[in-house]
């Protein structure tokens, strides 16, 4: 059996929807961030403002660096403390971007998870490298 792949797949065809990814406001606790990463089985959390606009992201590696540098108890740390170790201006894709273009961007920039936003910067979902390649 031959599998026919569409060459017109876009981010919206492959991205994880908001309900499937860790999303918090930037005033959340780091513990909540870690709990949500664990619950959603992803090594990234996206942060939005109250209007849903993407304001940054933290990876599990960013959190590790934060904990090692701050030497503060976990309950005392907020996500806003961690954004200096994370990315407050992440690369993003858009729902109608071609998967092949986003794969090239992810490969070039060595990105595993790419936030997908609308034209106003509102977070719509997340494209995981494995999902893009399937």
List the model feature ranges, each with a label.
Residues 25-28, 95-97:
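A structural micro-motif recognizing beta-strand termini
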Residues 32-69:
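Acidic (E/D-rich), amphipathic helical modules within compact regulatory domains
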